[in-house]
């Protein structure tokens, strides 16, 4: 985001309140770090996923498991996890970019990714005790 803070409209606020065009978040507002993360995930998808697309779609679970481990080793499974818990602590926008890039690749992998990060990891981060985190 630029050095000038915007009063970004959150969630569905645009439905109930007037919004100036300057306060709309757009891709031009992505930071260099966020764009680098998106590119890293895109490169990973091109190298590790797309050449094996048919195997993923034919339910090669071992390939999905191995690919998820590689994604984890690269930090893609912990983008939203705070650094003190071993994640990258990059926030919502970076998380959205990673999810968007992975979800556009192969359905079965994006389902595994979404289940791991959304159903598995985030509830522990948000609601787990210190030991669980």
Predicted features, each with a name:
Residues 1-114:
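Amphipathic, small/basic residue-rich leader segments at the start of a protein or domain
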Residues 64, 77, 120-121, 133:
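Alpha-helical structural signal
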């Amino acid at each position: 985001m630029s050095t000038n803070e915007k009063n970004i409209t959150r969630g569905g606020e645009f439905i109930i309140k007037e919004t100036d065009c300057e306060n709309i978040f757009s891709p031009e507002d992505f930071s260099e770090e966020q764009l680098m993360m998106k590119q890293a995930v895109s490169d990973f998808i091109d190298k590790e996923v797309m050449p094996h697309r048919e195997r993923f779609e034919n339910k090669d679970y071992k390939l999905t498991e191995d690919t998820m481990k590689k994604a984890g080793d690269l930090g893609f499974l912990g983008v939203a996890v705070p650094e003190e818990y071993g994640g990258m602590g990059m926030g919502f926008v970076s998380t959205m970019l990673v999810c968007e890039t992975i979800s556009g690749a192969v359905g079965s992998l994006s389902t595994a990714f979404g289940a791991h990060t959304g159903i598995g990891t985030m509830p522990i981060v948000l609601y787990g005790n210190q030991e669980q985190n």
